[in-house]
A protein has these predicted regions:
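Generic structural marker for isolated residues within well-ordered, non-membrane alpha-helices
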Residues: 90
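A structural signal for small-residue-enriched, beta-sheet-centric alpha/beta enzyme cores
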Residues: 1-70, 74-84, 94-119, 123-394
């Protein structure tokens, strides 16, 4: 059985049907009463939702010990009333959990520009926050979904020193996926004891290598937010580089797992695409090239159609003149098949390339051969299903 957030000691979570959606759980809470640190990464969208602004402000001064989450309504572009509704959600949740309102974050996802049905939310909150019912992480993973087809859950653990350190997380996302500091909604918990400053740095590093390397449709949401709570069960030495690197790698692993699950469940997707860029002169170059390929509608549609037109890859790789790249030294592979070597096409048969494109996971490797920096990005193919889902969404 898959482990969830609530399999980490000191973490409580669940969800309930409040009526925001027609017939599914749509209101959830994560409660970490003993949290010693919390961290968050947020969208930089100019129309950031009130939940983003409120939670970001709380994190600057306090350690969050809970977050109240709703799906089906973004509460974005809803003016002063939207801000008041966000604050009310935090205040009422805090009362029920015996916390300060500044210790409760708020996260929302769904349709933009529609007021929250506060009477439904306030009616459901007391039942949701009953301590005896806060033991269902799986239900919460389902409640945060919108156009997603599947729940997205991760649970990672590793020995650091003599302690078993755990990181668990849930996320949602299927469309409007192109990150700017975060992507969609994501919630992580870990049993480490570190300072807020260190946890924030580690989360930011993990997001930069995972969620920020993810693209379904190049659209950035108004509500993007990833939060992380530390229960404080096991201390790791913040001055010990080996221990800190081990924790950073564990957090990276959890975030990458969640990001790949989002890409695989992209709206209308039939194929997961992974673009690995290696031997670039700078990390920024490797990252930019990977994102250019994963963002390209021409690449996405070619992969969906299993079309071995590799010229679209070359277009995407080289379209930014600021990247330090020598076209005469670039190698490109699709799966195990080398299609470009030293900037020129190989004599590979189109049928061999098409065979690679029939797989469910498409690996594209770009070897710049002139440096030591690497980056990986994830996305999915672009299909008619994407259009159908978004014309029907309301």
């Amino acid at each position: 059985m898959k482990k969830h957030l609530t399999d980490i000691d000191g973490v409580f979570a669940s969800a309930i049907e409040s009526g925001i959606k027609k017939s599914k759980p749509d209101l959830g809470v994560i409660y970490v009463p003993g949290a010693v640190a919390s961290a968050g990464v947020f969208t930089q969208h100019l129309f950031s939702a009130s939940s983003v602004k409120y939670t970001r402000k709380c994190l600057k001064r306090h350690t969050l010990k809970a977050v109240i989450i709703n799906s089906g309504n973004a509460n974005a572009v809803t003016g002063k009333q939207g801000d008041e509704n966000t604050k009310t959600m935090a205040v009422e949740t805090a009362k029920l959990l015996n916390l300060s309102p500044s210790e409760v974050g708020v996260a929302s996802t769904g349709i933009i520009g529609v007021p929250l049905p506060m009477s439904k939310i306030l009616k459901a909150l007391p039942k949701l926050c009953q301590k005896e019912s806060l033991n269902n992480g799986q239900k919460l993973a389902s409640a945060i979904l919108t156009t997603d087809l599947t729940e997205k859950v991760t649970f990672k653990e590793a020995k650091i020193g003599k302690k078993t350190i755990q990181v668990s997380g849930i996320t949602k996302g299927s469309g409007m996926i192109a990150p700017n500091m975060a992507t969609t909604l994501g919630f992580l918990v870990t049993n480490v004891n570190v300072s807020q400053v260190v946890l924030q740095r580690c989360l930011k590093n993990a997001i930069d290598r995972s969620y920020n390397m993810l693209s379904v449709d190049t659209d950035t949401s108004t509500n993007d937010m990833v939060l992380c709570f530390a229960t404080g069960a096991y201390a790791i030495n913040e001055q010990d580089h080996e221990q800190m690197n081990a924790f950073q790698n564990l957090l990276n692993e959890a975030c990458i797992d969640l990001a790949k699950q989002i890409a695989k469940d992209g709206e209308g997707a039939t194929k997961l695409i992974e673009v690995h860029v290696k031997h670039a002169p700078r990390y920024s170059d490797a990252k930019q090239i990977a994102k250019q390929v994963i963002d390209s509608p021409l690449v996405k549609t070619a992969i969906h159609g299993e079309d071995p037109n590799w010229g679209r890859l070359i277009m995407a790789i080289g379209k930014n003149e600021t990247i330090k790249l020598n076209p005469n030294k670039v190698h490109v592979m699709i799966g195990d098949t080398v299609i470009v070597e030293n900037g020129l096409p190989t004599k590979i048969e189109r049928a061999d390339v098409k065979k690679e494109l029939k797989k469910n996971t498409i690996l594209i490797t770009v070897d710049c051969t002139i440096g030591s920096s690497n980056a990986t990005a994830w996305g999915c193919d672009l299909t008619k299903g994407y259009i159908d889902i978004n014309t029907d969404y309301n």
